UniProtKB/Swiss-Prot annotation:
Family: Belongs to the AccA family.
GO annotation, biological process: fatty acid biosynthetic process; malonyl-CoA biosynthetic process
Pfam family name, one: ACCA
The protein's enzyme class: transferase
Entry-linked InterPro entries: Acetyl_CoA_COase_a_su, ClpP/crotonase-like_dom_sf, COA_CT_C
Protein name in UniProt: Acetyl-coenzyme A carboxylase carboxyl transferase subunit alpha
PROSITE patterns per record: COA_CT_CTER
Localization: Cytoplasm
Length: 334
């Protein structure tokens, strides 16, 4: 069994939880006489420690710095695109290849059904997203979620297929960036991303984009032009990672915390700037603490947003989408 991943700022909480678990195990072991004052005292200690754990948990996760949110977004136990697809949707049929060079495993996509029987909603959609691995072997297979040009061309092929059959498009964004290798550049990485931006702006079907983890630069926006941009509470979205920003400005990665603050890359920051439309609330501690709850929350929001977008005609969708992205950004003079 893989060891539990504990981030540096989570260590005080982890240590308390470990102590609490040890006390619970000791209480159940039967080594404490059920009629003794010692057992009653131990129960009181456990209750007191439980309260301390809950209080510390809220204190930590309600006051995260921008860099700590970046760390949470990269947590290896966080749900990825395929996890969300299987938790939120039915009848997923993966489609492969860009019909030009190959099949990039860092981006997956296909038709699936998003439905809520209690709400009487059922809609076939095209779902596309970055996919990371869970261990060394699967990360190599998925190229650590860094897509090649053929990945973005595959994504565009699937979007055009969805447009042909008049199906909404949902993209799930989670990448440390587009793959920067020489081969990727030779095959037209920049052109593939630019083409996606151009074509996505004009898709005649509803498009919803969700940043579920990392949203780094062109690798993210290559599947990130939509009518509605949603973002998980502890995700990040920026033109550059804090480490890369730090290495450029300070010639060292040691200033990544300051870089994260300057980049204003969190969901709260981007909502205030008008870059995203809505924040998807995560379970306390991050999406990986309760993936099912996170998927249920996201599913409800997707259905709500789709219901509104499906009432709009193609011309309105395209006009509003272009106006939305054209209006982003500000110019400030010092």
């Amino acid at each position: 069994m893989a060891a539990k991943v504990v981030l540096d700022f989570e260590k005080p909480l982890y240590e308390l939880e470990e102590k609490l678990n040890e006390m619970r195990v000791y209480l159940k072991s039967g080594e404490v006489d059920s009629m003794s004052e010692g057992r009653a005292g131990l129960k009181r200690e456990i209750e007191s420690l439980e309260a301390k754990v809950e209080s510390l948990r809220k204190t930590i996760y309600k006051n995260l710095t921008r860099w700590q949110k970046v760390q949470l977004a990269r947590h290896p136990e966080r749900p990825y695109t395929l996890d969300y697809i299987y938790m939120m949707m039915k009848d997923f049929v993966e489609l492969s290849g860009d019909r030009n060079f190959g099949d990039d495993k860092a981006i997956i996509g296909g038709f699936a059904r998003l439905e809520d029987e209690s709400a009487g909603f059922s809609q076939s959609v095209m779902v596309i997203g970055h996919q990371k691995g869970r261990d060394t072997k699967s990360n190599l297979y998925r190229n650590f979620g860094m897509a090649q040009p053929e990945g973005y061309r595959k994504a565009l092929r699937l979007m055009k297929l969805a447009e042909k059959f008049r199906k909404p498009v949902i993209t799930l964004i989670d990448t440390p960036g587009a793959f920067p290798g020489i081969e990727a550049e030779e095959r037209g990485q920049a052109e593939a991303i630019a083409r996606n931006l151009y074509e996505m702006a004009a898709l005649k079907v509803p498009v919803i984009c969700v940043i579920i983890g990392e949203g780094a630069s062109g690798g993210a926006i290559g599947i990130g032009v939509g009518d509605r941009i949603l973002m998980a509470e502890n995700a990040w979205y920026s033109v550059i990672s804090p480490e890369s920003c730090s290495s450029i400005l300070w010639r060292s990665w040691n200033f990544k915390e300051q870089a994260a603050e300057a980049l204003k890359l969190t969901a709260d920051d981007l909502l205030a700037q008008g870059i995203i439309d809505r924040i998807v609330t995560e379970p306390l501690g991050g999406a990986h603490h309760n993936p099912e709850q996170m998927a249920s929350t996201l599913k409800s929001i997707l259905i709500e947003e789709l219901q509104g977008l499906l009432t709009k005609d193609a011309r309105t969708l395209v006009d509003e989408r272009i106006a939305k992205f054209s209006g982003m950004g500000v110019w400030e003079e010092s």
